[in-house]
Amino acid sequence: MRNSLIALTIGLLCTTAFSAAAAPNWKEIVGPAQAKLPEPLAKIIWRTDLQKALAEAKEQNRPLLISLRCLPCKQCSAFDKDVMEGGPLLSPLLSQFITVRLTDAKAIDLRFLPVHGYQDLDISWWGYFLSPEGKLYAIFGGKDHVSDATRISPEALAVTMKRVLAHHYDSRREKWDIDGPAPDLSGEPRSTTTLPGYQAWFSRGGAETKKQECIHCHQVSEIIRQPAIDAGTFDKFRDTQIWPLPENVGIVLDRDDGLLVKSVQANSAGANAGIRAGDSLAVAGERRLFGQADFRGILHRGPQETGTIPVMWLRDGKLMSGELQVSEGWRKTILDWRMSISQGNIGHGPGFFPLAMSKAERQRFNIADDAMGVKPFIYKGSMATAAGLKANHMITAVNGQSPNVVGRSFEWWFRSHFNPGENVTLTVQEAPGKTREITYVIPKE
């Protein structure tokens, strides 16, 4: 009996010691870096072959920066120009990386780039920071309903690169082992065209989709959700709440620093966790943070409804920890700017593009400023056009509802309120004071 108790005690002690050894020493990890950077590369080269770039990174023991840029999109074009030009802020840092530039989502190799949980696909510029073995250090990118410059800046990218370099060249990094597993490179590259939803998505795409040579990033988001849509399990209210903002947990971060807390809303998840203005976020969800996109990624992969997210932060050099307690509805953001949502494969569009009436037109047709005032751009052959909608019709209500929404806001409002197979009735004015109704069925395909 005594020997059994001794054995049990030793076993428990060993288990405790193993658990303690297995837990990352976050105080050391986020503390002062012990890194010595090598001489920068003589020239910044934006490579297009990811596998060759990885081999080059291994040979030189340099981290990789992989940028994905959807060239047709104007969104983030100014930021992309800043990155490509480099300048005195970015060039000295870019020259420390093996840089890769991909301009077609077909070129994404899913073995390296885990787009499903680590890339906001409605954004036309995104960055991945990888180790020479392909382990994921950090991500960079971001946008909101305000603009494409409220979440990212060249200064924010520079700070993130400095943090990644300090982490990569820290002699203790391999011992920490916090960067996740290296990718399995066996087999052929896995393009976005190998995703389960690709064939169904492509077959239902219009002539423009079938004609295009590349795949846009927002279309990858549509492809990813296609199987759930086909299975009838996709919830257009729950499953569209993607990439929450720091403000969703009550935290406002400095854009150019990425992790510095500017303010915390009273009684929010952030405030209740103990976070204050002036703190610097350091760790969340068991991942080290290098910038705002990393934190948003943790939120994105976090609870759908009620739950907790572990978080750590630095205050005057001292590491502190707490939990973000989130409740139902915490993920909600403004969605209509998202191309994959307002004009993607969720439901069906109205069959016209909803342009805004001018102030003079509203006055002429006696339409209140807070009511619907949509001037339709006519799509030839659409169900709305076939039902009699014309370009001179001013739309003032849909099924009796008259919110003041236009453009993509109208598109998402329509898709979120009405389902394929349902009847919709447009109330229109053909001339001032002359009202009629146009009814049609929303197509199922």
Which role does the model predict for each range below?
Residues 7-17:
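Bacterial N-terminal signal peptides
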Residues 65-77, 210-221:
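The canonical Cys-X-X-Cys-His
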Residues 52-54, 87-136:
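Thioredoxin-like thiol-disulfide oxidoreductase module
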Residues 282, 297-337, 390, 396, ...:
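PDZ-domain C-terminal substructure recognizer with occasional recognition of PDZ-binding tails
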Residues 91, 99, 119, 150-249:
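Sequence context surrounding c-type heme c attachment/ligation sites in exported
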Residues 46-62:
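A short beta-strand-turn-helix
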Residues 75-92:
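Typically the conserved alpha-helix immediately C-terminal to a functionally engaged Cys/Sec
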Residues 242-283, 287-290, 352-397, 401-404:
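PDZ/PDZ-like domain segments forming the peptide/carboxylate-binding groove
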